[in-house]
From Swiss-Prot:
PANTHER family: NUCLEOID-ASSOCIATED PROTEIN YBAB. It comes from the Bacteria. GO terms for molecular function: DNA binding. This is Nucleoid-associated protein RPA0616. The keyword Lipoprotein does not apply. InterPro entries: YbaB-like_sf, YbaB/EbfC. It is found in: Cytoplasm, Nucleoid. Gene3D superfamilies: Nucleoid-associated protein YbaB-like domain.
Length: 106
């Protein structure tokens, strides 16, 4: 019974740490770039897009398709960086718990 209570206490602590980590992830901001920095996407580590910046040289009617491609690439770059930041935080949180690799608590 003591083991069960210990597990419940550990689960409650983990839940508290997860809430704190979610708040930290909201504060982490990454920036994805494409076109040599002509297009930038800012995103939180919670995968929320915070802003998009487009160099004025790209805002031409005949450059629309290029701009769309660059936006998609910048978003993908920001998403990868946000995912890496989230994984880093999750590893720090769950590293001492002895969980099997790839459990996927994130």
């Amino acid at each position: 019974m003591a083991d069960f209570l210990g597990m419940m206490k550990q689960a409650a602590q983990l839940q508290s740490k997860m809430k704190a980590m979610q708040a930290e992830l909201d504060q982490i901001e990454v920036e994805g770039l494409s076109g040599g920095g002509l297009v930038k996407v800012r995103m939180s580590a919670k995968m929320e897009v915070r802003g998009i910046s487009i160099d004025p040289s790209l805002i031409k009617a005949d450059e629309r398709e290029v701009l769309e491609d660059l936006l998609a690439a910048a978003h993908g770059d920001a998403h990868r960086k946000a995912e890496a930041a989230m994984q880093e935080k999750m590893q720090a949180l769950t590293g001492g718990l002895g969980l099997p690799p790839g459990l996927g608590l994130g």
